[in-house]
C-alpha cells in the first residue's frame, strides 16, 4: 500500500529550506482611501477602501494632472489617520512642507519620513535595508508602513549621472526601464506577506498610435505588469464657480482618472474628479456621474431620481445631488453594492429579487 503524501511535513520542510518563503494567501487587510469615494470604488470595489497595503499602486499622468495631489497628499493623509507610518521619497525635489500641510499631511518626524533622492539604486537600497530590519522584528512589533515615491519618471540611473558628468549625453540605452521593472518586481515580492505597501507616481506621454489613443506610461511596460493597480490621469480645465455655474475663468482642474489595471474591480472604468484651486477636492466629486452611469440615478425631467432599498424615493436637482444635500449620496453608497448586484444577476437567478428590480427601474406615472 502506497504511503499517503504528508502535506504538513512537506510544508515544514520547504519552509525551512527556502528563506523568506510565504505560504498561503496574503489578501489585503488594510486599505487606504484616495480621498475620493468614486475613485475608491473604481479601484477596490468599495467606497471606503482605496489602495491596499502589501501591493504596489501607480498613478500615472501628464504634468499637473493631480498625481501628487492624490499620492503625496490625500493617500498620505488617510494613511496617517489610520496609524500607518509613511516614508515619502521625493525624486522631483518638488514637495514643500507648506504644500503638504495645506493638504492635511502631518509632517512631524513621528508620522512622516521624507527622503530626497534621485537614483533608482538608492531607492532600491533604501527599501531593501528597511525590509531586512522590518523582517527581523517580532510579529507584534511590526508597524504598518507605506512607501510613496513621487515620482518614478524623474529617477536616474548611474549611466545618466556618469554621462552628465562627462558631458556626453548618449542616453541610458534602455537601462532605466529595466531598472524600474526590477525595482517594482523586487518590491512586490518583499511586501507581499507584510503590512507594507507602495504608491508611486509616473509620467505619461501622448500616444502616436491612432488606433490606441490612450496616453503611454514612461519607463516601459515591465513595472506595469508587476503593479496591482494602475490609474492613468489626464488634466482638464475646471471652469465652474463654487455653486457649479459655468464661467470663463479657470478655477481648478478636472482630473480624468481611468483605472487601467486593478485586481479588485472592473478595469478601464473612469471618473472625472473636480479639484478647485481654492477649496480642494470634494470627496463626493464624480459620485453622481458614477451612479448615473450604472443606472441607479435616473433622469426625471430636470431632476435625478433614486429609489433606496427601503423603498424611499429621492428626487433632487443635479446640483443638490452634487452637494450631498440631506445625505443623499451617502444613501446611494449605502445601497449601491446591494442594488448593483441584483441588477447584474442573470435572469434565471433573480426569481426572488424580481420585485426589487422592478422597484429600482420603476418610473412614476404622470
Locate the predicted segments by residue.
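The Walker A/P-loop phosphate-binding site
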Residues: 2-110, 125-132
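A short alpha->loop->secondary-structure connector
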Residues: 81, 103-110, 163-173, 215-220
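Catalytic P-loop NTPase motifs of RecA-like helicase/translocase cores
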Residues: 95, 155-156, 207-208
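Phosphate-binding/switch loop-helix module in NTP-utilizing enzymes
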Residues: 118-195
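A glycine-rich helix N-cap at a beta->alpha junction
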Residues: 108-121, 227
Amino acid at each position: 500500500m502506497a504511503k499517503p503524501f504528508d502535506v504538513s511535513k512537506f510544508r515544514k520542510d520547504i519552509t525551512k529550506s527556502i528563506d523568506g518563503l510565504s505560504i498561503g494567501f496574503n489578501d489585503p487587510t488594510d486599505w487606504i482611501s484616495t480621498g475620493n469615494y468614486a475613485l475608491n470604488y473604481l479601484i477596490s470595489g468599495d467606497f471606503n477602501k482605496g489602495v491596499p497595503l502589501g501591493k504596489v499602486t501607480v498613478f500615472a499622468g501628464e504634468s499637473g494632472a493631480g498625481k501628487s495631489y492624490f499620492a503625496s497628499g490625500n493617500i498620505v493623509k488617510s494613511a496617517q489617520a489610520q496609524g500607518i507610518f509613511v516614508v515619502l521619497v521625493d525624486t522631483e525635489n518638488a514637495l514643500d512642507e507648506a504644500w503638504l500641510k495645506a493638504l492635511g499631511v502631518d509632517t512631524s518626524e513621528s508620522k512622516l519620513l521624507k527622503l530626497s533622492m534621485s537614483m533608482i539604486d538608492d531607492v532600491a537600497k533604501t527599501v531593501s535595508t528597511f525590509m531586512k530590519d522590518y523582517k527581523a522584528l517580532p510579529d507584534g512589533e511590526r508597524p504598518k508602513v507605506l512607501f510613496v515615491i513621487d515620482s518614478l519618471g524623474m529617477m536616474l540611473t548611474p549611466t545618466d549621472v556618469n554621462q552628465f558628468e562627462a558631458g556626453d549625453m548618449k542616453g541610458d540605452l534602455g537601462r532605466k526601464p529595466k531598472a524600474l521593472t526590477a525595482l517594482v518586481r523586487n518590491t512586490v515580492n518583499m511586501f507581499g506577506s507584510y503590512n507594507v505597501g507602495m504608491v508611486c507616481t509616473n509620467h505619461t506621454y501622448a500616444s502616436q498610435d491612432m488606433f490606441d489613443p490612450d496616453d503611454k506610461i514612461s519607463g516601459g511596460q515591465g513595472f506595469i505588469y508587476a503593479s496591482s493597480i494602475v490609474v492613468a490621469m489626464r488634466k482638464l480645465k475646471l471652469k465652474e464657480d463654487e455653486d457649479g455655474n459655468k464661467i470663463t475663468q479657470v478655477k481648478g482642474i478636472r482630473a480624468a482618472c481611468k483605472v487601467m489595471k486593478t485586481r479588485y474591480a472592473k478595469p478601464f472604468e473612469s471618473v472625472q474628479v473636480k479639484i478647485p484651486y481654492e477649496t480642494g477636492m470634494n470627496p463626493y466629486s464624480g459620485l453622481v456621474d458614477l451612479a448615473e452611469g450604472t443606472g441607479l440615478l435616473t433622469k426625471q425631467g430636470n431632476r435625478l431620481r433614486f429609489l433606496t432599498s427601503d423603498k424611499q424615493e429621492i428626487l433632487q436637482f443635479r446640483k443638490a445631488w452634487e452637494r450631498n444635500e440631506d445625505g443623499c449620496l451617502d444613501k446611494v453608497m449605502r445601497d449601491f453594492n446591494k442594488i448593483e448586484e441584483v441588477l447584474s444577476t442573470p435572469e434565471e437567478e433573480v426569481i426572488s429579487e424580481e420585485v426589487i428590480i422592478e422597484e429600482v427601474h420603476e418610473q412614476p406615472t404622470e
